[in-house]
């Protein structure tokens, strides 16, 4: 009797379903965010040797001293930004392997994702191509500077930690817009800034661990 090999698509779907149920148990309640996490295949954004860990709640290395954020952090940041509003035109700083941009594409009108490391940007393009997401645009740029040619943005999400919020990013936030960034070095916290005219109001959330936000391009 011959044995049929397991269907990787079905295995991935089951693993994603378990991940989503874990996210729900961890407090993620935004059904649109959970649906996006269910739809995007996280294993397609990591090296083949790490695919078995793709749906664990952990950050994974993607090369160049960068990581793909743990699923809970991705879901939590987007859920906070979506509370009571739509994301609209969104800037992601630190595209990395492209996973978060893919998730954002399902909950935002447009996604502009910038990455300062050229080989990572190329990898993100390769990872995203099979998904055919028409509302995602990738750009090779220093994320500290934002993307002035596409500003203003209703939402800005930064996937790297900084000592303070870069002024360029605040300037590119639309009135009523929200910006999420990890702040701190050893002790980091998620901080959301909301723009009301020229006034920026900050709200602080849980502790996190991100790679540092660096300047320039590589």
Swiss-Prot record:
Alphabetical UniProt keywords: Cytoplasm, Methyltransferase, S-adenosyl-L-methionine, Transferase
Pfam families assigned: PCMT (PF01135)
Location of this chain's protein in the cell: Cytoplasm
Entry EC number(s): 2.1.1.77
Active site feature: 69
Keyword Cytoplasm: yes
First-level EC class: transferase
GO biological process, one term: protein modification process
GO MF annotations in UniProt: protein-L-isoaspartate (D-aspartate) O-methyltransferase activity
GO cellular component, one term: cytoplasm
Chief location category: cytoplasm
Reaction equations catalysed: [protein]-L-isoaspartate + S-adenosyl-L-methionine = [protein]-L-isoaspartate alpha-methyl ester + S-adenosyl-L-homocysteine
Keyword Cytoplasm applies: yes
NCBIfam families the UniProt entry points to: pimt, PRK00312.1
Family: Belongs to the methyltransferase superfamily. L-isoaspartyl/D-aspartyl protein methyltransferase family.
Function according to Swiss-Prot or TrEMBL: Catalyzes the methyl esterification of L-isoaspartyl residues in peptides and proteins that result from spontaneous decomposition of normal L-aspartyl and L-asparaginyl residues. It plays a role in the repair and/or degradation of damaged proteins.
Name this polypeptide is given: Protein-L-isoaspartate O-methyltransferase
Organism the protein comes from: Aromatoleum aromaticum (strain DSM 19018 / LMG 30748 / EbN1)
């Amino acid at each position: 009797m011959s044995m049929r090999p397991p269907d990787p698509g079905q295995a991935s779907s089951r693993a994603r379903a378990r991940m989503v149920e874990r996210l729900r148990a961890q407090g993620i309640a935004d059904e649109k965010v959970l649906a996006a996490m269910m739809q995007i295949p996280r294993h397609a954004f990591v090296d083949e040797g790490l695919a078995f860990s793709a749906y664990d709640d952990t950050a994974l290395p993607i090369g160049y001293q960068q990581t793909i954020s743990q699923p809970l952090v991705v879901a939590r940041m987007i859920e906070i930004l979506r509370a009571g509003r739509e994301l609209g035109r969104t800037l992601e700083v630190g595209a990395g392997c492209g996973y978060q941009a893919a998730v954002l594409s399902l909950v935002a009108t447009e996604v502009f994702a910038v990455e300062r490391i050229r080989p990572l940007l190329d990898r993100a393009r390769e990872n995203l191509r099979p998904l055919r997401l028409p509302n995602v645009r990738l750009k090779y740029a220093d994320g500290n500077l934002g993307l002035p040619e596409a500003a203003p943005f209703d939402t800005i999400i930064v996937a790297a930690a900084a000592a303070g919020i870069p002024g360029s990013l605040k300037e590119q936030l639309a009135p009523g817009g929200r910006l999420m960034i990890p702040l701190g070095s050893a002790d980091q916290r998620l901080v959301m800034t909301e723009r009301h005219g020229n006034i920026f109001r900050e709200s602080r959330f849980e502790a996190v661990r991100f790679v540092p936000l660096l300047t320039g391009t590589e």
